[in-house]
């Protein structure tokens, strides 16, 4: 067999091995674009996008709309902080606008936040330390800046995750989400 005939036979065989299925057209579902908000720091992002399914229990939410409360995902993808306060402000609640530094802390293993402990400290520092129970909490810290909140819990072993949140100076009004 000559070289040209061999090449032609190879092409015919290869053509028979491929399938030509019709391409399906994907129709996009309209969704509202997720926004990011001031309040996260050192790699943590606050968003109104849809949180992980495990963190959605107890919420009444219409698919395709912005999430009602800004939230941040922890470092291992296994914790969420719902920041009702939109932004934290240093010192004791209530803040100058009459609201509180309220956060709901959840872990994938404990979505209610039960059994979760939270320790907050200024980023890269050992002190001061603020200890908070998981679940819904008022999070008052003594100073402005980027704070690291380490969440820990025991469920089939010891687990930790980190969420970094910016704290505004005392007396600063937090920004309102658009």
Task: Write out the residue ranges for each language-model feature.
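Bacterial signal peptide processing site
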Residues: 18-20
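Contiguous segments within soluble domain cores/interaction surfaces
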Residues: 25-142, 146-178
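C-terminal motif of bacterial Sec signal peptides marking the signal peptidase cleavage site
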Residues: 13-16
């Amino acid at each position: 067999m000559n070289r040209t005939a061999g090449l032609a036979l190879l092409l015919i065989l290869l053509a028979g091995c491929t399938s030509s299925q019709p391409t399906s057209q994907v129709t996009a579902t309209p969704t509202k674009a997720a926004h990011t908000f001031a309040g996260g720091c050192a790699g943590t992002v606050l968003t109104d996008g849809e949180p992980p399914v495990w963190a959605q229990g107890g919420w009444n939410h219409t698919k395709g709309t912005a999430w009602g409360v800004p939230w941040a995902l922890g470092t291992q993808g296994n914790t969420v902080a719902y920041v009702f306060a939109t932004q934290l402000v240093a010192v004791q609640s209530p803040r100058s606008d009459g609201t509180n530094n309220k956060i709901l802390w959840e872990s994938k293993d404990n979505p209610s936040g039960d059994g979760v402990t939270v320790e907050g400290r200024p980023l890269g520092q050992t002190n001061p330390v603020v200890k908070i129970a998981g679940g819904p909490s008022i999070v008052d810290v003594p100073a402005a800046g980027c704070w690291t909140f380490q969440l820990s819990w025991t469920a089939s072993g010891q687990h930790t995750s980190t969420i970094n949140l910016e704290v505004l100076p005392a007396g600063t009004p937090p920004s309102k989400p658009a």
